[in-house]
Amino acid sequence: MKKIILFGIAFLVISCNNQNQSKIMEITKNEKLIKQYFEYFNKHDWKKMSEMYTETADFKDPSLGPGIITQTRKQIEDKYAELNNIFPDLHDKVIQVYPSGEKHIIVEFVSTGTAPDNSKFELPICTIFTIENGLITKDFTYFDNFEEGE
């Protein structure tokens, strides 16, 4: 009888561990996806980066205006290509990645670039990505949009 109980407990522990492994694997996939995202960003491969989103994705981004804005892949690609024209050396340095549940990754990073007039910017940013079925469905970005002189 003791062997049966011990076997049952061992089976239960192994079963619970396998469920946790599945969740860990999902988080790892999402972290890899976001790592690839920033690699495409820093290579200025806007097409490949835009293909990491669903056909239309929700954005919350001070540069797009207030509220949630829906963007197509083409709009995403065009937005970053335009930004890259203004700042040819545009670069994001990831500071920290914070997995949050099965569908969210929070990324803290610093965006930098130099304009044609040699003025530089350095902008700390935090983005919450929602990832479903291997694609980004939401990109909620937060940064201080305050400009001097306003």
Residue ranges with predicted function:
Residues 16-51, 55:
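Short, low-complexity N-terminal intrinsically disordered segments enriched in polar/charged residues
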Residues 34-37, 49-50, 57, 72, ...:
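Hydrophobic pocket/interface hotspot
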Residues 85-86, 113-122:
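Short, cysteine-centered beta-strand-loop-beta hairpins and adjacent loop/turn segments enriched
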